[in-house]
Regions:
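Extracytoplasmic/periplasmic solute-binding protein
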Residues: 181, 185-194, 199, 223-272, ...
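Short, solvent-exposed loop/beta-turn-alpha elements that line the ligand-binding surface or hinge
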Residues: 75-76, 160-175, 234, 239-244, ...
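A structural signal for short loop-to-beta-strand junctions that line the ligand-binding cleft
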Residues: 127-130, 135-140, 168-207, 351-356, ...
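Long, aromatic- and glycine/proline-rich binding clefts that accommodate carbohydrate-like moieties
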Residues: 175, 340-347, 392-444, 469-475
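Glycine-centered hinge/linker elements that transmit conformational signals in sensory
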Residues: 225-230, 268-299, 345
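Extracytoplasmic/periplasmic substrate-recognition and gating elements
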Residues: 130, 211, 284, 289-294, ...
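Extracytoplasmic "Venus flytrap"/periplasmic binding protein-like
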Residues: 99-175, 206-217, 307-309, 313-317, ...
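Hinge/lid segment of periplasmic solute-binding proteins
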Residues: 68-77, 144-198, 214, 223, ...
Length: 475
């Protein structure tokens, strides 16, 4: 018997697709009909055959995009952009420069930071922006004194629209109104406050205990304490320091003492008043402190010298910047963390204001930048957002209220100094001329070349001549 087998598909038609790796084959039954031809008749037989079928399963997976708050979280601009920043170096501004450089990791953004000594950085800004034309800088670091000088001259861009635009996104209300006021002229906001600062007392608690000294409340107390410790004490470089190592340093110390005596730089007509009785008293008190506590060597003892001397135990006390105080609680920098203590700045007059000024540092955008101000502002804000300032609070005095708990042990002393101190510079462009002329003549008192009266009168005469030429005083 010849048997011919014809296969007919009578069951399911299986559509096969690519399976996911995790899917397992499914067994199904296929019915096949077999036709068998026999002699004289045709017989149809039905046979069930098991085959494997692959099942395709589509699985939807939601993947969370994790944003690292410590990084610069900006979208890449369409075209390559180079941003240049200039400022001056101290620990907290070094930190912010590193935060700015994080935006260098964003595709098409290149960030260059240039940190110089303060006087050098300010001079570079003046030279670059006073000439007109395109600014070589996109981000400029300035402090209170530069607001009146640089923004008042029209060199800086008002940022009101950008502050309003990004107020919620970057929680700019977390920065106190007083800090914004410090960078505002006639309603125009010219910068983002990134640093709070003042000068306050830093001292060795163990040394003061050893000599039976209380924390000084006035500079007369400081002078008395220096007499107890001794200017010629072999254990120390000197008993106490203020900073008179440069012209700009003399001017800052003089400003604090002058205001504490009730004086000021200018009257309502921009005529000088700093050479009057309060000014003479201020210079005389500075010299009295220097002679009693520092000696001639102290006149050249700069900020870095003072900081290191405190850290290695060669200086019992100083009135120093809060921005430097953070290093005093760093065990990697000093073995004296447990005995270094902090107090508000002394007064020059009992029950008068503390001889400590209030400062902020700002990032500003030059008016003639060639890059997109919106992008520049966002780069600044990525460097000064809440997480950045939380980390920065461990290094210096930042501006956001929400991160105060992360700051160092000096913050209470710094805050009390600001609250009870002499305030900020007036935001008058003419004040920049005053500061420059005082920085020129006051050091001559320290060298003995001029008396306090002679130096102040010389500075006043030079100021009047320059301010008149520039139109700040009617001729």
């Amino acid at each position: 018997m010849r048997k011919h087998k014809f296969w007919l598909l009578a069951g399911l038609v299986v559509a096969l697709s690519l399976a996911l790796a995790a899917c397992q084959p499914e067994t199904v039954t296929v019915v096949e009909t077999v036709v068998v031809e026999k002699e004289g008749e045709t017989v149809v037989e039905t046979v069930e055959v098991e085959v494997e079928k692959e099942v395709v399963v589509t699985e939807v997976v939601e993947k969370e995009v994790i944003v690292d708050p410590t990084e610069c979280n900006l979208d890449a601009p369409a075209e390559e952009v180079e941003l240049n920043m200039i400022g001056w170096s101290f620990p907290i501004t070094d930190f912010y420069a590193e935060e700015l450089r994080k935006c260098d990791k964003v595709e098409n953004i290149n960030v260059n930071t240039n940190l110089l000594a303060s006087a050098d950085a300010q001079e570079q800004v003046r030279l670059a922006l006073s000439a007109g034309g395109d600014s070589p800088y996109d981000i400029v670091h300035g402090a209170n004194a530069q607001v009146g000088e640089w923004a008042g001259a029209g060199w800086m861009m008002p940022l009101n629209d950008l502050v309003d635009k990004y107020w919620d996104e970057y929680n700019l209300g977390d920065i106190p109104e007083k800090a914004w006021e410090g960078v505002t002229i006639d309603g125009n906001i010219y910068g983002v406050p990134i640093v709070g600062n003042t000068l306050h007392l830093i001292y060795r608690q163990d040394v003061y205990d050893e000599y039976g000294l209380d924390v000084p409340e006035t500079y007369d107390d400081v002078i008395e304490d220096c007499g107890v410790i001794g200017l010629d004490n072999p254990d120390f470089d000197m008993p106490f320091t203020i900073n008179l190592s440069a012209g700009w340093a003399w001017e800052i110390e003089f400003f604090q003492f002058l205001r504490a005596y009730g004086g000021d730089y200018l009257d309502e007509n921009n005529m000088p008043t700093f050479q009057e009785e309060e000014g003479v008293k201020a210079v005389e008190k500075l010299v009295e402190v220097a002679d009693a506590c520092m000696g001639m060597d102290g006149y050249s003892f700069g900020l870095n010298d003072q900081e290191v001397a405190m850290q290695i135990g060669l200086l019992p006390g100083t009135n120093m910047w809060a921005s430097r105080a953070a290093n005093m609680s760093d065990p990697e920098r000093t073995d004296l963390v447990d005995v270094i203590a902090y107090a508000p700045a002394p007064r020059v007059v009992e029950d008068g204001p503390r001889a400590g000024s209030a400062w902020n540092d700002f990032y500003m955008i030059p008016a003639n930048t060639t890059n997109d101000p919106d992008l520049i502002f966002r780069v600044i804000m990525e460097a000064a957002d809440e997480r950045s300032q939380r980390d920065g609070a461990e290094i210096g005095m930042v501006t956001r209220l929400s991160v105060a708990e992360y700051g160092g042990p000096y913050l209470e002393a710094a805050g009390q100094t600001i609250a009870e101190g002499i305030g900020i510079y007036d935001k008058d462009q003419a004040v920049g001329i005053v500061r420059a002329r005082l920085g020129e003549f006051l050091p001559l008192v320290g060298t003995g070349e001029m008396t306090p009266e002679e130096a102040l009168n010389a500075a006043a005469d030079a100021y009047i001549e320059e301010a008149t030429a520039q139109g700040f005083i009617d001729g």
